[in-house]
């Protein structure tokens, strides 16, 4: 089964996640099919906390990909910034 989940990156005590489409059998940080964006839980000030390609996200959902609970919650509350909306 294909899933949409967070792949951890960053340094020790400084998490940074990529939102990826991957086969469920792959490891959390292993090979993935497509990168849909990122999530920075420690974003401060003007830093972007979440960037997500909603067109690609919705396309994968239509194809049958299952989002994780955390990704589903992030996508539900996602509002693109003005830069992303005009691009």
Curated annotation (Swiss-Prot):
Pfam families: Ribosomal_S16. One of its GO terms (biological process) is translation. Belongs to the bacterial ribosomal protein bS16 family. The lineage of its organism: Bacteria, Pseudomonadati, Pseudomonadota, Gammaproteobacteria, Moraxellales. Keywords: Ribonucleoprotein, Ribosomal protein. This is Small ribosomal subunit protein bS16. Signal peptide: none annotated. One of its GO terms (cellular component) is cytoplasm. It comes from the Bacteria. The keyword Manganese does not apply. GO terms for molecular function: structural constituent of ribosome. The gene is rpsP.
């Amino acid at each position: 089964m294909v899933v949409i989940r967070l792949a951890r990156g960053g340094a020790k005590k400084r998490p940074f996640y990529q939102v990826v489409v991957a086969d469920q059998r792959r490891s959390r940080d292993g090979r993935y099919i497509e990168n849909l964006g990122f999530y920075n839980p420690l974003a401060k000030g003007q830093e972007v906390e979440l960037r997500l390609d909603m067109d690609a996200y919705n396309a994968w959902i239509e194809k049958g990909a299952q989002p994780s609970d955390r990704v589903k919650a992030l996508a539900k509350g996602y509002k693109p910034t003005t830069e992303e909306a005009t691009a």
